[in-house]
């Protein structure tokens, strides 16, 4: 399908536009894919006939556990949230959990299997793939990229094998920003972190040269998938972004450089895997009710009044 460039639509704010206004904003800005974090019925209704591809998250950990424990609950979930909307809503993937703690990987796999089986019973499993979105720190030894390996192979390898057997992608939330912030600029250069030219890093393990931390992070995931025996599983970057305020390295200039750089870059792929990378920028809006550090409320491309925080251009 070429380079899919999506934006994550978080709703953790009390001043955000209506769901239908948000869908129109996506269309007017040439944003062709969306991720939502639960099956919000208003959003799904607004997406009908929009032509926008969708990653649909099932919701929080409690929902993942219910889906894992009860195949009939999973079948009902698919009926209510998928069959009721597809194909008017172009659901592409179902994310069973977002950054679920490592101790729950067993129930994640059961939930993924139950949702996949429910889709198969509805003759939808070839069109809609089931995955889970993980934090980047499921990878250890991520530098050099060729050394990447799963931190918890007993939990992640069975998930990778399930993805391989069903033709589903590995969804990973990849944030060079947090690596740069935690490093405090000691070893990671800002231009390398924000996809700007000027820094090259050679991986002596695979002979490849890297000009961005994003590429190095993605390729370390591919290295881990290869070591797990699943080299054909494709990585989809289910979140990536840079905050415009609220913490070390967070500024409008850095956020624009990173996010516009990412939009422009995903068409070319990584040194290890040339070709388009399906990528979802986090996030559409600054969300004023998001918990955590101040940066968490400043990842948006847009203010709640639909005005851009800084200019970005998405290709047609």
UniProtKB/Swiss-Prot annotation:
It is an enzyme of class 3 (hydrolase). InterPro entries: Glyco_hydro_17, Glyco_hydro_17_plant, Glycoside_hydrolase_SF. Gene3D superfamilies: Glycosidases (3.20.20.80). One of its GO terms (biological process) is carbohydrate metabolic process. Its EC number is 3.2.1.39. Its main location: cytoplasm. Coiled coil: none annotated. GO terms for cellular component: cytoplasm. The active site is at 99 (proton donor), 239 (nucleophile). It is found in: Cytoplasm. Keywords: Cytoplasm, Glycosidase, Hydrolase, Plant defense. GO terms for molecular function: glucan endo-1,3-beta-D-glucosidase activity. It catalyses: Hydrolysis of (1->3)-beta-D-glucosidic linkages in (1->3)-beta-D-glucans. PANTHER family: GLUCAN ENDO-1,3-BETA-GLUCOSIDASE BG1-RELATED-RELATED (PTHR32227). Belongs to the glycosyl hydrolase 17 family. May provide a degree of protection against microbial invasion of germinated barley grain through its ability to degrade fungal cell wall polysaccharides. This is Glucan endo-1,3-beta-glucosidase GV. The lineage of its organism: Eukaryota, Viridiplantae, Streptophyta, Embryophyta, Tracheophyta.
């Amino acid at each position: 399908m070429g380079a899919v460039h999506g934006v994550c639509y978080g709703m953790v704010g009390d001043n955000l536009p209506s769901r239908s206004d948000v869908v129109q904003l996506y269309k007017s800005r040439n944003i062709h894919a969306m991720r939502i974090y639960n099956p919000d019925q208003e959003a799904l209704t607004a997406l009908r006939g929009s032509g926008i591809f969708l990653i649909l998250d099932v919701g929080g950990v409690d929902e993942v556990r219910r889906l894992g424990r009860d195949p009939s609950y999973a079948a009902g979930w698919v009926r209510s949230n998928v069959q009721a909307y597809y194909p008017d809503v172009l659901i592409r993937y179902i994310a069973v959990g977002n950054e679920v703690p490592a101790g729950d990987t067993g129930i994640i796999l059961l939930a993924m299997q139950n949702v996949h089986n429910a889709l198969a019973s509805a003759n939808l499993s070839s069109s809609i793939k089931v995955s889970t979105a993980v934090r980047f720190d499921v990878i250890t030894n991520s530098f050099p990229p060729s050394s990447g390996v799963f931190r918890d192979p007993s939990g992640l390898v069975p998930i990778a094998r399930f993805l391989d057997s069903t033709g589903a992608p590995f969804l990973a939330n990849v944030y060079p920003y947090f690596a740069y912030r935690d490093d405090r600029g000691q070893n990671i250069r800002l231009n390398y972190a924000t996809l700007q030219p000027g820094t090259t890093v050679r991986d002596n393990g695979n002979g490849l040269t890297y000009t961005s931390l994003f590429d190095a992070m993605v390729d370390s995931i591919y290295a881990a998938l290869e070591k797990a025996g699943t080299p054909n599983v494709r990585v989809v970057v289910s979140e990536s972004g840079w905050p415009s305020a609220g913490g070390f390295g967070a500024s409008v200039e850095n956020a624009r450089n990173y996010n516009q750089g990412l939009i422009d870059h995903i068409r070319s792929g990584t040194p290890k895997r040339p070709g388009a990378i399906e990528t979802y920028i986090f996030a559409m809006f600054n969300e004023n009710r998001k918990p955590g550090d101040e940066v968490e409320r400043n990842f948006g491309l847009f203010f709640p009044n639909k005005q851009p925080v800084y200019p970005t251009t998405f290709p047609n």
